[in-house]
């Protein structure tokens, strides 16, 4: 957490929610990484920018998660831009919260999936969109967890209940 007026708070307006960027252990590890790997990449990963530290972390994440493989992205924007296109096709549908982050919206646009948008955190509208998309092979509900523009939190229990009910 970060401290504001003497009170520990979660900083939801930055990518450093918990204030770990200034934590002594993180700083010490960053200094060690600079000594071992230098500063910056020679290029983007798919050309020649992958270092052993990336491979090591991806393997450790795969072992921890029990997955065949893992890929790291340099930003959430890049991750969202690369996700939807790789898992969805024209016979699929994405049902997206109206206030989703721009990176989610752009990622969905890059996919060839049918697109539906439900009113922010409105479970009745989400259910209506799930019904409208019922002919799709796969229906994927896309939502932020915490919405960066207004700080609201997704109704994950409600979304999960509707996803289960509509096989999404």
Positions of the model-derived regions?
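Active-site-proximal loop->helix
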Residues: 86, 104-111
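Short, structured coil segments at secondary-structure junctions
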Residues: 90, 110-112, 166
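Active-site phosphate-binding strand-loop segment of PLP-dependent enzymes
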Residues: 116, 120-168
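Conserved PLP-anchoring active-site segment centered on the Schiff-base-forming lysine
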Residues: 83-102
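Short, small-residue-enriched loops and turns at beta-alpha junctions
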Residues: 19-20, 47-50, 102, 123-124, ...
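N-terminal "arm"/small-domain region of PLP-dependent enzymes with the aminotransferase-like
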Residues: 1-39, 168
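Conserved N-terminal alpha-helix of the aminotransferase class I/II PLP-enzyme fold
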Residues: 28, 33-76
């Amino acid at each position: 957490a970060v401290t504001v007026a003497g009170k520990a708070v979660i900083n939801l307006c930055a990518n450093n929610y918990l204030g770990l960027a200034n934590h002594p252990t993180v700083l010490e590890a960053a200094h060690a990484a600079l000594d071992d790997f230098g500063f910056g990449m020679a290029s983007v990963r798919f050309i020649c920018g992958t270092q052993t530290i990336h491979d090591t972390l991806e393997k450790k994440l795969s072992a921890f998660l029990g997955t065949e493989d893992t890929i790291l992205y340099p930003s959430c924007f890049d991750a969202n831009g690369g996700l939807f296109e790789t898992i969805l096709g024209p016979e699929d549908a994405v049902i997206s919260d109206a206030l989703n982050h721009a990176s989610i919206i752009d990622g969905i646009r890059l996919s060839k999936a049918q697109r539906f948008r439900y009113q922010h955190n409105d479970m009745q509208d989400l259910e209506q969109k799930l019904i409208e998309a019922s002919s799709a092979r796969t229906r994927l509900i896309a939502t932020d967890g915490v919405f960066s523009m207004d700080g609201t939190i997704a109704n994950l229990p409600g979304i999960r209940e509707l996803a289960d009910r509509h096989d999404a």
